[in-house]
């Protein structure tokens, strides 16, 4: 019995190692594409450029992506998830912030700071976002043990002090407001620098919350 268990363990470890190798190759391709799209531009980057920069065979690319447009879409979802997960991880280090609306404002502020520190992310993500595409990104889970963005949003919402009508529409309006007003402020300091925009932006987000509130939950 012990021998059989040992064989099972060896096989499980072997499968896990293979899965890790696959994930590493996929990550390498995404990182390569990100670097090339930012530095050379999407139109001037070929699949050959991506695989050569990643150090993998061209056939490996087609194990994960259909074409250049497909890897760009996966890349945007991947980067958007990374940014949100980093903001959410930071929120978890602040257990004193337990109000839903304050949590959303904290995550928004953290994401804007990440974008301000990395203009390449703003250029990649903001230029190609539409609600239809981003809605798919919201349900994208990068790893089996990592929840999707919208799953986290629903979890935070379930502990909110208020109930809200049309939570998805509320999320959409906040997303559009933040992405639409912050792009030029981050990249060009227009019409005002980001730090000057933030108080007005957050006041507008609070207005959206109030607009969608139904009632306060009973404790």
PLM features: residue spans?
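N-terminal intrinsically disordered/low-complexity leader segments
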Residues: 1-24, 213-219
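Helix-turn-helix
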Residues: 28, 36-70, 74
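Pre-recognition alpha-helix immediately N-terminal to the DNA-recognition helix
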Residues: 28-36, 106, 110
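Alpha-helical DNA-contacting segments of helix-turn-helix folds
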Residues: 72-82, 86, 125, 145
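Hydrophobic alpha-helical connector segments
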Residues: 74, 89-117, 174
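Short secondary-structure transition hinges
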Residues: 113-151, 187
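Hydrophobic/aromatic-rich alpha-helical bundle segments in the mid-to-C-terminal region
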Residues: 123, 158-204, 215-219
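Amphipathic alpha-helical packing segments from all-alpha helical-bundle domains
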Residues: 133-161, 168-172, 199, 206
């Amino acid at each position: 019995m012990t021998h059989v268990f040992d064989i099972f363990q060896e096989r499980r470890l072997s499968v896990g190692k293979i899965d890790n190798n696959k994930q590493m190759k996929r990550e390498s391709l995404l990182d390569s594409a990100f670097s090339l799209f930012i530095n050379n531009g999407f139109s001037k980057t070929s699949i050959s450029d991506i695989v050569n920069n990643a150090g993998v065979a061209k056939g490996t690319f087609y194990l994960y992506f259909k074409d250049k447009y497909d890897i760009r879409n996966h890349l945007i979802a991947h980067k958007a998830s990374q940014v949100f997960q980093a903001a959410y991880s930071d929120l978890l280090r602040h257990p004193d912030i337990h109000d839903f609306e304050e949590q959303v404002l904290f995550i928004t502020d953290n994401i804007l700071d990440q974008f301000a520190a990395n203009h390449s992310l703003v250029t990649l993500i903001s230029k190609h976002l539409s609600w239809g595409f981003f809605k798919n990104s919201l349900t994208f889970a990068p790893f089996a043990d990592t929840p999707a963005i919208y799953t986290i949003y629903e979890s935070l919402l379930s502990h909110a002090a208020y109930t809200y009508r049309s939570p998805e529409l509320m999320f959409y309006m906040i997303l559009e407001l933040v992405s639409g007003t912050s792009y030029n402020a981050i990249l060009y300091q227009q019409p005002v620098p980001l730090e000057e925009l933030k108080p007005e932006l957050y006041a507008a987000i609070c207005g959206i919350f109030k607009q969608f509130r139904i009632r306060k939950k009973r404790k």
